Each structure stands twice: as C-alpha cells, then as structure tokens.
C-alpha cells in the first residue's frame, strides 16, 4: 500500500487543501511563477502542491463485498504469520469466523465474496513470504522461475508483468512552463481525481516545473500517461499588434494569461503568441478579451485588478457624493484614501460587457478637477487603431480626413462592445477639455485621454447604450434638476433602492415632463418580473409583468423586438387616467434603441433606457447636433454626444463650439448642475 511518506514532510497543508478541492486564488498565484521572469532553482515549501490519495473518512471496515484492501491485507498477513496456521486455505477458512469483524455482513453471498477476496490476499502474502526466502537462498533468475511456477501452477493465478507490482514506486516528470500553466489552470480537479482513483500521491513543484508521482509500481505509468494526455490538444496562434500594445501585453503577460485562460507571450517585436487548450474558447474570443484588458491597463495606468484578490467592498464620500467600489489588490489597508486624496481621483465604477468581467466591478480612476486651459485649437488626436501611432492631427483635420465629406459620428469613453460599436480608437491631447474631465478616464497626464469613435449610419435614429450581463449593485439613481432640460426629458430607470438582490419587485421611476411651466410630478411604480437562475431579469425572453398598484396590473409579452417592448411599457405608463398628459404617448419614439445579444444562457442585457434630447445649431454652412444622455455607469450625463459637420464649412469645428456654447461645462457630481449652459 502507498505510504504517506510525503505527508510527513514540512509542507504547507493549506496549499494541499486548496488544490485538492479546486484551483483557487492560491493556485492562480502559483501560475505567475511559471513565466520566464520567475526565480528558478529555489525550492520553497510554499511552491509545492500536494494532492494526496483518497482516504475514507471512517476508519470502520466497510461491509462486504466492498471490503477495504487495508482490512484484507492485514487479515491475510496475520494469518500467514500465525504459527498455529499450517499455511493451507482449509485452515484459513476454519479460522475466518474468529477473525471476521462483527460489522461484516454474514449473508451467503457476502461470505463467499469475503472468502474469495481473502484467498487472493492470502496467496499474495505467502508469495511475499516465499520471495524473502528465495532472495536469500537463490539467484534472481531462479527466484523468478519459482515465483512464476507458484503463481501459474500451485496458486492458479496469472500475472501480467512484474509480480511485485504492489511495491511502492516514485516517478519524476518534468513539464515545460506551458504544460505546467494549463495543468494548474484547468486540470487541477482532474488531477485530483486521477490521484484518488489510483491511490497516488502527486507532488507539483511550481519552482522547477516538476511533478513527482508516488504510487504502486503498476499505477505510476498509468498516472503519468493520464497527466500527459492533458496537453494533447494545445493550439497556438500568433497575432500582429502595435509595438505599443505589445509592450503593455509583455509587461502584464502573467495577469493577462490568467484572465484570458490562455498562455500569452511575446514572440516578436510586434507579435503576440497565444496558446490555448481548445474547448474553453476560440482564438477570436481570446483576442477580444485581450484587447479589452489592454484598454483597461492603459486607462487605469495600474496593473489589472485581480478578480480573485478583490476584498471587501469600500465606500467613501467626496464632494457630497458617495462612491462604492471593491478595494483592488494594489491598495492595501487605508492607503487607498490617501491615494485618492493625493491624486484628486474619484472612483468611477464601470463594467465591460466581456463575459469574463461581468462577475466583478472594475474601478477606473477619473480626475475630479477639469483642465482650465481654454485653448481649443490645441486638441490633437492619434489613431491608436493603426500600427503607426507617431503621427498626430488636429481633431478637425482628422474628422475630415477619416470620414470625408458629411460626417456623423459618436464619441464615447467606454471600451464596451468594441467590435460592434467602435470603428476607431483615438487618443487626444486636450488643451481644453471639450468633453469635460468627468467624461474621460485619464492616466498620468490629466490633459491626455483615450476615447472611441464610430461613424454613425443614417439608418440609426437612436443612440446606443451599454449592455451588461447583470444589474450591477452600484447603479445610482440620478435626477436632472434643471427644469429647462427636463422639459424635453423623459426617462424610465431603476430606482436606487430597487437594486438589492433580495427584492423581487424593483421600482421603476417615471420623470414626467413639465407642462405650462410646472413640473407635473415624479411617480414611482413597481415592476414585477420573472427570475431565472438566481438573477433578476430586466427584459425577459417571455413576458414582463407591470404593476402600478395592487389593483393595476398588466403583462407585456416580449415576443417581438425590444423597441416594441419599450413602446408597450411607455404606453402603459402613459395612459390618460395616469398622467393626464397626451404628450407622453408621442414621446415613446425617443427612447433609446437597443438590441439584445443572442445567448442561450442569459435572458437580459439592457441596463437602463431613457429618452434623449437633441439640439441643432446652424452657423453659415455648418451645423452641430449634440445630444444629452445619462449613463449610470460613469455618473456622468455627457457620456455620449454627436457632432455633425459639412466639408464646405466656413468655420472649423472648434470655432463653432466656442461661438455657440463656449465649450461644454464640466458636470459637477456635488450638485448635479445643468449640462448645457
């Protein structure tokens, strides 16, 4: 039997439990030492992962025919060593009753099974006893012949291989870093099952990529083959990126490998090699994840927040506004307060639509104070979508060169749905923050920001919003207090007190427009909706139950499009007996346009929806169109705006903005003042 010799060594038992149960955060930390920048040759007990063999919790003997091998071997050994026994099975069977535990079933079938099991064990024990004698008195060749004769003729047993297969054997297997990475990442539970099935100790040494297998001699080769079979389906692909991106990826290859579930490494000056075990995700999905993560690296100017190391939820109040976020691993204790205060950063929580990130909230620092320099002509942009990032242009020149004659496009600070929503990714140097400081996530230089642009199709009549897989708990309820803006503003949002996961009927808040100079009111209603897999559904696949009071109730089916669904909701809330305002029925066409992602395991995508107000201003041969929209992800109203220019304009883009609105005033989170002066 396998002896627990390795367990007697001074090895961290917590590490054993970690990997034996499931690959947890501790296992992910060990993956980091696999990359090339790790220290080699130093064997630390914390770098050893022990997967012990399976041992039954109960020490009592199991009922026959499921007798433990421990009991059978011990009983046979006792019978062989007993001087009163004449080494014959007849004598053994006569004494079975005296040795058999009371807990063993004494039925005829169970007794017969016990006799057969004991017979084999007894023969093996006698064989071991004979082998000791032959080892002393005979040569190895003579011993082998005698053992084979005993087994084949006298004991009626046929063997396959060495007769000493039950002896303990140790095998060292050396893996490459790539194989060790996938072994720890995806196959810890499989390795645990292998060790339990074959009663083998498996010791993983992360320091030198070595695996030690301690098991019965006949099982060592089997365990080694099963472990090697894990790496038969590895595939690799090389992608071309810019040198700027390659540098970011190379510096953060370990964290990116963990998050993308693939081995990421630099293969050239501007090439990245991706190795994956197919079955998890395709190369295209990994590339999309990698791009999203790199954007986060660039925006935060910090290492990517490790989801496995996120600790308790924190909150603090700044400028009369309360921020909730999860403390990342690089801010320990209370140092995050000092860090925020020194950097004048607020914590603006944002979520990417990438599947790998929906479980956690990522924190993006956003400067509180805007830039003061009003030299609008100093705005320059660089196209980060192209490999050559050295050339920069004035924003107005870039607009004309990239989008040609009549231009209609969107800006956004969010990196969500990059392939669907954005065609260009830009960085701009702002002498004057056209988009306001709360609009963009800055890095080291508060006057330099990255944003995303998409050429807008004429067929699109509404804005896009951000899609997420879950309703985030940090969503806030904001109100625009300016009456002028509210006159044309109609929105349906989730109220802030409706976000607890324990609530079955979250609230919907209706902001009614102003009529004849008076605010008609703000009403709060309840939505009753179905639940699926423990998540609240905002837009279910089948139907939505709308409830205003205990007596007013309506079910709206979602069997057409999202637009039709929203129109039904608006018409239900806009009935004359409710609002006394016929204008609300016509306002449903101004709701934001959404499209759900096709998925079999998710049932809702829309985070919030609201009406937007559009303003048109024309000067000479040019005109500008801009829209006010509220995005709860960044606590900023001006997360999207639209600019429309014509090529034969007698004034440039900056002169138009300066002359009409004097630049966009920044949005103060302290008092939520008006967006447009």
From Swiss-Prot:
Q: What GO CC terms are in its UniProt record?
A: mitochondrial inner membrane; mitochondrial nucleoid; mitochondrion
Record flagged with keyword Mitochondrion: yes
Protein keywords? Membrane, Mitochondrion, Mitochondrion inner membrane, Protein biosynthesis, Transit peptide
Disulfide bonds, paired cysteine numbers: none
Gene Ontology biological process? mitochondrial translation; mitochondrial translational initiation
Q: Where is the transit peptide?
A: 1-41
**Top-level division of the source organism's lineage:** Eukaryota
Q: Which residues cross the membrane?
A: none
Listed GO MF terms? translation regulator activity
Output the Pfam families linked to this UniProt entry: KH_SLS1_1, SLS1_C, SLS1_N
Q: Where in the cell is it found?
A: Mitochondrion inner membrane
What does the record say about the knockout?
Decreases protein level of mitochondrial translation factor mtf2. Protein cox1 absent. Abolishes growth on the respiratory carbon source glycerol.
InterPro entries assigned to the protein according to its UniProt record, in alphabetical order: SLS1_C, Sls1_KH-1, SLS1_N
- Report the protein's function: Translation activation factor that as part of the MRH5C complex specifically recruits cox1 mRNA to the mitochondrial ribosome for translation initiation.
The entry's family comment says: Belongs to the SLS1 family.
Share what the entry says about its subunit structure, partners included.
Component of the MRH5C complex, composed of mrh5, ppr4, mtf2, and sls1. Proteins mtf2 and sls1 form a subcomplex that serves as a scaffold to bring mrh5 and ppr4 together. The MRH5C complex associates with the small subunit of the mitochondrial ribosome.
Q: What is this protein called?
A: Mitochondrial translation factor sls1
Question: What organism is recorded for this protein?
Answer: Schizosaccharomyces pombe (strain 972 / ATCC 24843) (Fission yeast)
Name of the gene encoding the protein in the UniProt record: sls1
